[in-house]
């Protein structure tokens, strides 16, 4: 999630540490340079390319040494598996095969015209060898976001910027704009790579396609890239915005082009020309990496299916500039009439496209057409013939019949063949645009329905809440008024009286009266304490007297008890005396008897 947020906040930069090891180090440098950093990219010159074999060996060793320090080594039978090297090696092998094929197909030429063509071909081969050594900037961050264009109309905002970006040959609408000279040679290699990508594998097409797109960076200075970074951000968003717009009517931008139309940037005129081989072999239109990436991503299904989305005319975005289909100056009035009749008869949507793009070219600038025609060039060259000698002979025959001094063009027949095949997929015209627009309408209706249901359900609650809020606001206002009145009363009345009561200078003040009463109470308390001391002494005396009285009472009780006891004995004293007397008398009688008995017995 952090990576996604960082990518949305910084769409022009990429963390190179997260890229797979198969990407070379120059990939990240190109990204930083396109974002306006101080990293400078060397401009490509007309220097020979090193041999592919040493480059491949060097790339393998460097790639293995770099990746082995970060990744675990995978071995099969104790032999390390070296990862697939950079696509630069594949491009080198592709270039070598192309050189060998051109040498085999090149006929024996002797005159000046043939030598000129041979020289141009060799120059194109050298230029392609320089252009295929770098990888382009590829990433979803260069295509903008769908949410930036769905609910806003930026036609008025685009007019000023577009007119400024195309106002001169030196002004760049994005960091990847290159000069006409550089674009002339780069487009030659691009056409060849696209044709080989259809015959070869998908990886070969990706390598060639990406290498050509990134080479455009090397044709511009770092200061120009920094000054036009904002325009490039606009350009990438404009691509997605115009692709998602539903088509109006039956207009198709590619219906306005025909076989004899060649776009050539010039400082004096930006119209439709019939040029020599040097100009006809290229469609000199600057294309941004956003467009390249857009069609490159859509090419996955187009390689195996000729009726796929990429090859159908419904895929064509409606953003080609009208300057590519108009001419301000011409070398021949006959050619202009032929072009006009062909455009009006075969491609009826030219007027619509011109009216749609008229505000963008109101400044009267005579620059190259729009920068998003790489998809058109790819469609025109998707069925390029492999037999170059046949193309050469057919073009040479046409030039000889017309008596013109123009050199033969190796791509004119391919344009006518590809134009004839554009009608194969007419059933799919505007299918995807209509499908996307229909889905957007359905989504919008669903959103509106849900919004209305929610509003109807919650409207009563909102009204009740507002009423409660109004009542609470009124109560709070009344409470605030009461608090203000109370504060005024306290300040003006109670605080004044309180201050007067505690004024020490006033003898009649409450504080002074309180002091006097407290002093009097203290004096009374002191007198009470003295009286309490006297009472305590008296109490001690009374306690001693009470103790004596208690002892006397106890003695008296004992005497009373003894008296009571003596009284009971006194009552029975005569009885006791009688008993004692009887006992004595009985004893005396017994004694007397004994005596008498003894006496008589003697």
UniProtKB/Swiss-Prot annotation:
Q: Where is the composition biased (Basic and acidic residues)?
A: 96-108
Post-translational modification, briefly? Phosphorylated. Is dephosphorylated by calcineurin.
| Compositional bias per record (Polar residues), positions renumbered to this chain | 352-369, 399-408
Q: What is the lineage of its organism?
A: Eukaryota, Fungi, Dikarya, Ascomycota, Saccharomycotina
Alphabetized InterPro entries for the sequence:
HPH_family
> Positions of the region Disordered?
31-55, 83-108, 323-369, 399-419
User: At the top level of its lineage, which domain of life is listed?
Assistant: Eukaryota
Modified residues annotated as Phosphoserine in this record: 167, 342
Q: What is this protein called?
A: Protein HPH1
Q: What is its main location?
A: endoplasmic reticulum
Span-the-membrane segments of this chain are 575-595
UniProt-annotated location(s): Endoplasmic reticulum membrane
């Amino acid at each position: 999630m952090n990576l996604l947020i960082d990518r949305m906040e910084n769409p022009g930069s990429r963390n190179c540490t997260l890229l797979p090891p198969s990407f070379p180090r120059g990939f990240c440098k190109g990204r930083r340079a396109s974002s306006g950093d101080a990293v400078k990219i060397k401009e490509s010159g007309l220097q020979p390319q090193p041999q592919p074999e040493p480059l491949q060996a060097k790339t393998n060793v460097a790639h293995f040494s770099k990746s082995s320090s970060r990744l675990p080594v995978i071995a099969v039978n104790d032999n390390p598996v070296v990862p697939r090297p950079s696509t630069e090696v594949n491009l080198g092998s592709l270039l070598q095969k192309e050189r060998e094929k051109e040498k085999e197909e090149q006929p024996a030429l002797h005159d000046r015209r043939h030598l000129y063509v041979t020289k141009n071909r060799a120059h194109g081969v050298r230029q392609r060898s320089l252009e295929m050594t770098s990888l382009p900037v590829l990433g979803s961050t260069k295509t903008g976001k769908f949410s930036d264009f769905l609910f806003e109309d930026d036609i008025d905002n685009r007019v000023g910027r577009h007119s400024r970006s195309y106002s001169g040959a030196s002004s760049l609408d994005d960091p990847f704009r290159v000069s006409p000279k550089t674009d002339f040679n780069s487009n030659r290699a691009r056409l060849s790579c696209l044709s080989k990508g259809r015959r070869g594998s998908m990886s070969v097409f990706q390598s060639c396609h990406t290498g050509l797109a990134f080479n455009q960076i090397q044709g511009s200075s770092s200061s120009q890239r920094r000054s036009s970074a904002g325009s490039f951000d606009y350009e990438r968003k404009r691509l997605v915005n115009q692709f998602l717009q539903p088509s109006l009517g039956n207009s198709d931008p590619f219906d306005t082009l025909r076989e004899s139309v060649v776009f050539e940037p010039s400082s004096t005129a930006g119209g439709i020309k019939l040029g020599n081989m040097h100009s006809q072999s290229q469609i000199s239109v600057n294309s941004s990496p956003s467009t390249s990436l857009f069609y490159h991503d859509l090419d996955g299904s187009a390689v195996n299916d000729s009726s796929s989305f990429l090859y159908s005319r419904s895929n064509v975005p409606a953003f080609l500039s009208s300057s590519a289909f108009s001419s301000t100056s011409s070398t021949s009035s006959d050619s202009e009439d032929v072009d006009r009749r062909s455009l009006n008869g075969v491609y009826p949507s030219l007027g619509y496209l011109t009216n749609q793009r008229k505000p963008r070219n109101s400044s009267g600038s005579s620059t190259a057409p729009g920068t998003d025609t790489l998809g058109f060039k790819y469609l025109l060259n998707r069925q390029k013939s492999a037999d170059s000698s046949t193309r050469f002979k057919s073009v040479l025959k046409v030039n000889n019949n017309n008596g013109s001094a123009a050199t033969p063009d190796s791509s004119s027949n391919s344009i006518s063949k590809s134009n004839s095949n554009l009608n194969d997929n007419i059933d799919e015209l505007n299918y995807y645009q209509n499908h996307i627009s229909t889905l957007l309408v359905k989504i919008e209706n669903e959103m509106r329905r849900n919004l209305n249901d929610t509003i109807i359900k919650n409207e009563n609650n909102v009204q009740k809440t507002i009423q409660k809020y109004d009542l609470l606001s009124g109560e709070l206002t009344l409470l605030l008024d009461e608090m203000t009145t109370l504060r005024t009363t306290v300040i003006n009345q109670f605080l004044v009286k309180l201050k007067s009561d505690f004024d020490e200078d006033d003898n009649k003040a409450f504080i002074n009266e309180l002091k006097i009463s407290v002093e009097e109470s203290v004096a009374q308390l002191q007198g009470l304490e003295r009286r309490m001391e006297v009472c305590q002494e008296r109490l001690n005396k009374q306690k001693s007297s009470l103790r004596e009285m208690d002892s006397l009472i106890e003695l008296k009780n004992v005497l009373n008890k003894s008296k009571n006891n003596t009284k009971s004995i006194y009552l029975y004293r005569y009885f006791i005396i009688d008993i004692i007397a009887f006992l004595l008398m009985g004893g005396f009688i017994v004694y007397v008897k004994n005596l008498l008995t003894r006496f008589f017995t003697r």
